[in-house]
Amino acid sequence: MGLTLGERVQHCLLVLVSGLFLALFRLLSPGTKRPKHLPPITNPLLTLSAVQLAEKIRRGEVSSVEVVQAYIDRIQEVNPLLNALIKDRFSAALLEAARADKLIKEENGGEEVLRNQFPLLGVPMSVKESFGLQGMPNSGGLKSRGKVLASVDAPPVALLKRAGAIPLGVTNTSELCMWMESNNHLYGITSNPYNLERICGGSSGGEGSIIGGGASVFGIGSDIGGSIRMPCFFNGIFGHKPSRGVVSNDNQFPRCSGLQNEYTGSGPMCRYAEDLLPLLKIMAGPTADKLTLSKAVDLKKLRFFTIVDDGGSPLTSPVDRQLVEVQKRVAARLEADLGVTVQEVNFPQLKYSYQIWDTFLALPDKDGKPPEAFVELMADGGSVWPVWELIKRIFGRSEHTVAAIGLALMESSHSSKSSEFILKQKEDLQREMEDLLGTDGVLLYPSHPLLAPKHHHPLFMPFNFSYTGILNILGLPVTQCPLGLSKERLPLGVQVVAGLCQDHLTLAMALYLEKAFGGWVDPGVV
């Protein structure tokens, strides 16, 4: 038994209509001049990892004030082009940097004491606006929440600050953090540092853009369908969605409801692979004990697998040939360097990735309480009628984006009963994937079927996120790794997946792939 006839017809119509509108959009879009990218980085402090900066600051080789000021200067240089950081706290950050420098001068216990107590002392960071950062906006990109300020820090933000990190500000998201382009009617649209005509991804797109543009050392994102991994892929940086239940999702807006907390992962985003593990360890707090992050990894003793696409879902775009080829190059490099065999595998259930993601996000919690409806989040205590919002949008009068209105309309067409076929597909996929990976398996899987699309084009390819979304439902750890640039000078990349609580394996792979393929590339020199 497969999808019902009605479900198949609905999905086919969505794909057909999306394709027709994309063709029309391309036809009517005005031509533009040669795409612009960012100016190159000139300050060498901006090319150091968080680990390196923390060490230099502790040793007095550079002051925290110097580092923070260098990043403020870079933000002021590139943010007018990117629109990634939507509210800064530069004055407060400089005061905190001065206090960090004072603490270092007065510490009698030496560098080791500082390293143990404050591993990130004096290092600047950025924060996704949906996370609570005390005194800063916390709207989730919803215009009606434009004056809402966070009263407390989200737990992972608090842990990073306690470790000595200094927030520079908060970054843009998609409306209600449920779309793959960071655009809303409160802050506007955020661009890709490698090509300003392209999307930066979502919903942690502001983080991806500001970090990829060399204007933040590292940041923090949340991921319910790829919201860390897609921005990291499009912006050429590293990101990690942890195993389920490792990092707290509290004090974020939108809040998780139903079973969404199980499928949402908060994690680090950065330009350098060596930062991933220490950042994850700090963000997880005591829950880090669920993982074996300090365990040494011998890549030669791992088993490697690769999946080249989702099996041909009619809802998703074919995987770009350059992404197929770079994933093959990763497999070949692993075999040559490590003497291992990378086995190509296939899971027929992946063809239903979108339907699985959509079904499981709508399930009630253990007490039978359903998740808060998307349209209720849009209404923010008032009332919203999606059809009326669409009409208003046509005349430029709606406070909501086309993407959010479309999601609300799709939600209203959902069946109240979950498909038994889809429930079984997920159950089978979960079992087979966990059996395959075990405690020593690593899987390569495309990050997205396309390179960073042009602005607004995802509206006509709405299901491509399912390449990342399916892994949220499985709850497995995934590290997004950059793999150089395409012929269009856009980032290439791959997802690296491991078994539950085997995060240390994917983080070790990130270090290997950075060395093998070069890691992050300054977008100003492309």
Swiss-Prot record:
Reaction catalyzed: N-(5Z,8Z,11Z,14Z-eicosatetraenoyl)-ethanolamine + H2O = ethanolamine + (5Z,8Z,11Z,14Z)-eicosatetraenoate; (9Z)-octadecenamide + H2O = (9Z)-octadecenoate + NH4(+)
Residues spanning the membrane: 12-32
Record-linked SUPFAM superfamilies: Amidase signature (AS) enzymes
Gene Ontology terms: cellular component: membrane
EC nos: 3.5.1.99
GO molecular function, one term: fatty acid amide hydrolase activity
Catalytic site positions: K128 (charge relay system), S203 (charge relay system), S227 (acyl-ester intermediate)
Bilayer topology term: Single-pass membrane protein
InterPro entries assigned to the protein according to its UniProt record, in alphabetical order: Amidase_CS, Amidase_dom, AS_sf, FAAH2
A single GO BP: lipid catabolic process
Main location: membrane
Cellular compartment(s): Membrane
Assigned keywords, A-Z: Hydrolase, Lipid degradation, Lipid metabolism, Membrane, Transmembrane, Transmembrane helix
Entry similarity comment: Belongs to the amidase family.
PANTHER family with a match to the protein in the record: FATTY-ACID AMIDE HYDROLASE, FATTY-ACID AMIDE HYDROLASE 2
Protein name according to UniProt: Fatty-acid amide hydrolase 2-B
Organism: Danio rerio (Zebrafish)
